[in-house]
C-alpha cells in the first residue's frame, strides 16, 4: 500500500456511513431531519471501553456496571441526538501470549452478564438516538467483513466507521473532527509494511505481553503503562536487557535500536525469552506462530521508516503521542499546513481524540476559537470520563458548539468552552 493511500484510507462520515464502510455517503434508507425539531442537540462521545473476555488481565471489570448504568442514562435522556464511540469498544489485543486470541464474538458474549452489551443494544434500538462506532487500535480489525458483521448483528442500527487498514473518523458540520487518535502514534498506527499481508502494529504484541504479566502477577498492566515506564526510562530497559544476557545497552536517543530494545525489555519483564512464541491461530495472516525474536526482526525499522509511511506527524512526535501527548496532533489539525491539506476535507474548529486514557480539555481563544478534548476512558484504573457537544443556533446565522468534559459521578462538567461560527446551513442529524 502506498503512503498516500494509507493516509487517505480512513472512513469519514458526516451524517452517516453504511455498515460496509465507505466515504460517508448517506444511505438512501436514512431520512435526515433536524435535531432541533425534537429538542435533541447534544452529541455524547465516549471511547476506550476495552470490553474483553472475562479474565484477570482484562482492563474493564469493575467499571462495567457503571458503564452500563451510564449507557442506560444516555438512553433515557431527551436531549441526546447521537452517541459516538471513538474506538476501542472491543479489545482483542489484550490476550496472554500463549492463549488463542479471543474473537469479537467471544468478547460480546462475555459482556452480556455485566450489562454493557444489553445497555448499548437498548441505545441502538432508541429511534431518537443515533449510535456511531469509530474504529480504534485495540479493535483495529473491525474493518474485516466477518468482524464488522458480528458488530452489526449485535448492535442493529449502529453506524460502523472502520475501513482498512483500521482507520476511521467522524465529522460534523465541517467543524468537528473526531477519531480514536492511534493514526498519529508509532506503536499503534496500522502497520501494513512490517508483516506482509498484516495490519497489526508492534503495540499489539506489547499488549499481549502486558496481558501475560497481568495473568501471572495478579496486577493488571495496560499498554500505556508499559510504554510510559519503558520509553521514558532507558535505565529500566537496560536493566532487563542485561538480566536477559543482551549485549550493549539502550542509549538516550530514540532510534530503531531503542524501539526494539524497549520491546525486548518488555518481553523479558513479562517473562518471555527470544524463542518464546505468540499464539496467533492465523490471525492477521500469520501462518505460523512468531517468536519474540521474529517480532523484533519484523518491526526493527518502524522508527526510521515512519516518515516514508506518513507525513502528518514526524517519528519523534509519533512516539510522544503514544505517551499521552495527542494535543500536538490536534493543534496540527487546527493549523492545517499545506502539506496535509489534501488529507482532510476541512480545517476543524473542534477536535476530539481518545486512545491516551487521559481525559483532556484545551481551549484557545483569539481570532479563531478552537477546542481539543480527549474523551479519556472507562477502564478500571482510570476515572470514567466522556465529552459532550451541545449545538445551538444563535442570531444572524451564528452556531455555537459548547464542548464539555465530564467525569462520571459528578453533577457538572469539569471543563467546558464554546466555539462560535457563522453558518447558514441547518444542523442535520440522521434518524432511522
Predicted regions and their residues:
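C-terminal segment of N-terminal export signals and the immediately downstream linker at the start
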Residues: 1, 21-42
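Compositionally biased, low-complexity segments enriched in small residues
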Residues: 4, 26-27, 373, 387
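Extended recognition/assembly regions associated with phosphoester-bond processing machinery
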Residues: 38-432
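Short, cationic motifs built from Arg/Lys/His that form the positively charged side of catalytic pockets
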Residues: 3-4, 50
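N-terminal export signals
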Residues: 7-28
Amino acid at each position: 500500500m502506498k503512503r498516500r493511500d494509507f493516509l487517505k484510507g480512513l472512513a469519514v462520515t458526516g451524517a452517516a456511513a453504511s455498515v460496509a464502510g465507505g466515504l460517508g455517503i448517506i444511505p438512501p434508507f436514512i431520512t435526515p431531519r433536524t435535531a432541533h425539531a425534537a429538542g435533541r442537540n447534544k452529541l455524547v462521545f465516549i471511547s476506550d471501553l476495552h470490553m474483553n473476555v472475562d479474565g484477570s488481565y482484562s482492563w474493564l471489570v469493575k467499571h462495567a456496571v457503571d458503564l452500563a448504568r451510564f449507557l442506560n442514562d444516555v438512553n433515557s435522556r431527551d436531549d441526546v441526538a447521537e452517541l459516538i464511540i471513538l474506538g476501542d469498544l472491543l479489545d482483542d489485543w489484550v490476550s496472554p501470549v500463549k492463549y488463542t486470541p479471543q474473537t469479537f464474538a467471544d468478547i460480546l458474549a462475555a459482556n452480556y452478564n455485566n450489562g454493557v452489551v444489553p445497555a448499548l443494544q437498548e441505545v441502538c434500538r432508541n429511534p431518537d438516538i443515533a449510535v456511531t462506532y469509530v474504529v480504534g487500535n485495540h479493535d483495529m480489525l473491525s474493518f474485516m467483513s466477518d468482524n464488522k458483521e458480528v458488530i452489526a448483528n449485535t448492535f442493529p442500527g449502529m453506524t460502523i466507521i472502520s475501513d482498512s487498514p483500521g482507520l476511521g473518523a467522524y465529522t460534523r458540520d465541517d467543524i468537528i473532527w473526531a477519531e480514536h487518535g492511534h493514526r498519529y502514534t508509532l506503536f499503534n498506527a496500522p502497520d501494513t509494511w512490517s508483516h506482509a499481508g498484516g495490519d497489526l502494529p508492534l503495540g499489539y504484541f506489547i499488549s499481549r505481553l502486558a496481558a501475560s504479566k497481568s495473568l501471572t502477577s495478579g496486577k493488571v498492566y495496560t499498554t500505556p503503562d508499559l510504554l510510559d515506564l519503558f520509553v521514558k526510562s532507558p535505565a529500566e530497559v537496560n536493566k532487563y536487557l542485561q538480566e536477559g544476557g543482551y549485549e550493549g545497552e539502550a542509549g538516550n536517543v530514540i532510534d530503531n535500536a531503542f524501539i526494539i530494545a524497549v520491546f525486548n525489555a518488555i518481553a523479558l519483564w513479562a517473562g518471555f525469552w527470544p524463542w518464546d512464541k505468540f499464539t496467533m491461530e492465523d490471525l492477521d495472516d500469520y501462518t505460523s506462530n512468531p517468536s519474540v525474536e521474529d517480532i523484533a526482526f519484523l518491526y526493527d525499522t518502524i522508527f526510521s521508516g515512519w516518515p516514508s509511511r506518513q507525513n502528518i506527524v514526524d517519528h519523534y512526535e509519533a512516539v510522544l503521542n503514544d505517551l499521552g501527548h495527542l494535543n500536538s496532533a490536534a493543534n496540527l489539525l487546527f493549523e492545517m499546513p499545506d502539506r496535509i491539506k489534501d488529507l482532510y476535507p476541512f480545517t476543524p474548529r473542534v477536535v476530539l481524540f481518545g486512545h491516551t486514557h487521559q481525559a483532556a480539555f484545551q481551549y484557545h481563544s483569539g481570532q479563531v476559537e478552537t477546542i481539543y478534548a480527549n474523551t479519556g476512558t472507562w477502564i478500571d484504573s482510570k476515572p470514567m470520563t466522556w465529552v459532550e457537544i451541545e449545538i445551538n443556533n444563535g442570531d444572524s446565522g451564528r452556531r455555537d458548539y459548547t464542548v464539555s468534559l465530564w467525569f462520571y459521578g459528578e453533577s457538572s462538567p469539569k471543563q467546558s468552552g464554546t466555539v462560535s461560527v457563522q453558518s447558514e446551513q441547518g444542523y442535520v442529524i440522521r434518524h432511522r
